[in-house]
């Protein structure tokens, strides 16, 4: 569980499902008592704030997002690992100065921030200063601090399907928008990556994704369509290629590939059958 009321229910021996708020845990939480639920990263900032003072801490970061942020930098990048940067550092600085650029000299394509429910941002977003408000405004989020870099060999339709598959598995099942709505989104993405999609499906993805964001009960459900909606907004041409021409430019959707065998080079390994 990641949502605060679901965490509390798990601690009480109940099923890990969220509840409507208010009341918030600070008013009625564990065993009905006032309960403070925070991320470990938030709590880790407390000692240095107490030691050096809030005024010193406020000198780091942006106007509305103070301090630093830890990211798990991964993907098609030369330097992977945990990094800590001041709020306001740009995505470009993280990817190219700290991350060392794209692995193998490939072309940058996208960066996904915020974990499985985060959005996929493009080259035009690289100079965006990292803070809570800026990432939300661009269709992504800070989330758990995940940051995955993608290159020209990644298919953004397949990427959206990958993250949504995770969300469907992790849904607690309590609210209908998340339990059923995300399954419908995943079914459509499977159709598209298998060459059975239509342009009508693209409109359905957009409409249904927004409904889920507006009506799901907890943060997981409300943010789960982000990978779909952000890739639709930023890589719409890839979706169109999949549904109109039944082609995947990144050659990641196996159902859209056509294989040929060169008899002169074939060694009979049968790998092409797998």
Q: Model segments located where?
A:
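Short, conserved aromatic-histidine micro-motifs
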Residues: 21-48, 112-114, 199-211, 242-254
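Hydrophobic alpha-helical positions that pack around
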Residues: 1-87, 99
């Amino acid at each position: 569980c990641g949502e605060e009321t679901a965490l509390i229910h798990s601690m009480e021996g109940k099923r890990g499902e969220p509840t409507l708020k208010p009341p918030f845990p600070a008013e009625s939480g564990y065993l009905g008592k006032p309960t403070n639920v925070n991320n470990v990263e938030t709590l880790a900032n407390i000692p240095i704030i107490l030691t050096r003072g809030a005024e010193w801490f406020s000198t780091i970061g942006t106007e509305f997002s103070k301090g630093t942020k830890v990211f798990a930098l991964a993907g098609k990048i030369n330097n992977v690992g945990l990094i800590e940067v001041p709020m306001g550092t740009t995505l470009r600085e993280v990817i190219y100065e700290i991350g060392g650029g794209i692995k193998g000299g490939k072309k940058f394509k996208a960066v996904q921030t915020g974990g499985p429910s985060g959005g996929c941002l493009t080259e035009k977003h690289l100079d965006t200063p990292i803070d809570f408000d800026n990432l939300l405004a661009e269709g992504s989020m800070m989330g758990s601090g995940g940051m995955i870099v993608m290159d020209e060999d990644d298919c953004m339709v397949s990427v959206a399907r990958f993250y949504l598959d995770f969300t469907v598995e992790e849904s607690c099942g309590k609210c209908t928008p998340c339990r059923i709505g995300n399954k419908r989104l995943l079914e459509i993405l499977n159709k598209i990556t298998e060459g059975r999609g239509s342009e009508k499906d693209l409109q359905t993805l957009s409409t249904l994704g927004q409904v889920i964001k507006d009506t799901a009960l907890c943060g997981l459900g409300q943010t789960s369509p982000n990978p779909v909606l952000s890739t639709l907004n930023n890589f719409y041409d890839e979706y169109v290629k999949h549904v109109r021409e039944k082609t995947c430019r990144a050659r990641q959707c196996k159902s859209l590939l056509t294989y040929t065998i060169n008899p002169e080079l074939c060694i009979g390994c049968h790998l092409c059958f797998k």
